[in-house]
């Protein structure tokens, strides 16, 4: 089979299996199997592939057809212009979180700020901020040792070892520092909504997805705890789930935060909350 024929048959299979963007998935996997870029594939459409080239692709295609995330199969994900390692130790970063980082960057006035990323996962938020603000003191915390190991590998990959201090802990436990900014993309899915999730999402660790019966429990607890860890006038920035904004905005007001506001993601969903304390 030629490169083009393999792409066409793989895309057709993915479409039958209900995979979104089947042709794009096929291109990524074939490029990965051949050690090429997607653009290089277009220059080789008529080249015939031998069995040694097809063998590794078959396993990737099978796993993708069963719902394993493309990012896990490739082992990497692009986020905010950088390539991060990605596997089942942490949540696959979402486009909404790239928007969160862009918003946070626009709100940092002091390049030497002390910043905390809560629920860092693979480290994409903390490390993206470290790239942008090399003079900042950046901390990142997660309850999962596996996620922290992946974040550490990403720090090495990006040449940022030592630029982010990774800590193991549940929310703000084991942290004595005070921060100018706390940012968090915590689990915000209700356990009762598990059946609504795609096969791809269910490959992410449960600890990175589910927060409790309502879904906003962890964010609510962070709102409470952050009052003792923010410097006067410090900012809390949160990514939240669908339909959670009203209750969480009320929680911020009840806990005496000020300058409280929200922002929609690119899909028009209220996804981000901002507030200052003190």
Where are these regions (language model features)?
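Conserved beta-strand segments of alpha/beta enzyme cores
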Residues: 83, 137, 163-165, 258-261
């Amino acid at each position: 089979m030629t490169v083009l024929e393999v792409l066409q048959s793989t895309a057709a299979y993915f479409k039958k299996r209900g995979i979104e963007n089947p042709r794009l998935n096929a291109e990524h996997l074939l490029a990965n199997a051949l050690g090429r870029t997607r653009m290089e594939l277009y220059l080789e459409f008529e080249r015939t592939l031998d069995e040694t080239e097809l063998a590794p692709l078959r396993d990737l295609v099978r796993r993708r057809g069963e719902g394993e995330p493309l990012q896990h199969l490739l082992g990497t994900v692009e986020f905010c212009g950088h390539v991060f390692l990605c596997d089942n130790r942490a949540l696959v970063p979402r486009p909404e979180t790239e928007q969160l980082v862009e918003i946070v960057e626009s709100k940092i006035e002091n390049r030497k700020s002390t910043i905390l990323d809560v629920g860092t996962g693979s480290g994409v938020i903390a490390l993206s901020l470290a790239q942008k603000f090399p003079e900042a003191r950046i901390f990142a915390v997660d309850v999962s040792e596996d996620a922290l190991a992946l974040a550490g590998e990403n720090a090495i990959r990006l040449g940022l070892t030592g630029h982010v201090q990774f800590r193991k802990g549940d929310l703000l436990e084991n942290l004595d520092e005070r921060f100018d900014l706390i940012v968090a993309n915590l689990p915000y899915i209700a356990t009762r909504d598990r059946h609504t999730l795609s096969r791809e999402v269910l490959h992410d660790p449960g600890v990175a997805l589910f927060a409790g019966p309502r879904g906003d429990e962890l964010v609510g607890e962070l709102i409470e705890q952050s009052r003792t860890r923010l410097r006067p006038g410090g900012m809390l920035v949160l990514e939240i789930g669908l339909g959670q904004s009203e209750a969480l905005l009320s929680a911020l007001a009840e806990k005496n935060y000020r300058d409280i506001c929200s922002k929609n993601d690119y899909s028009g969903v209220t996804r981000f909350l901002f507030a200052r304390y003190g």
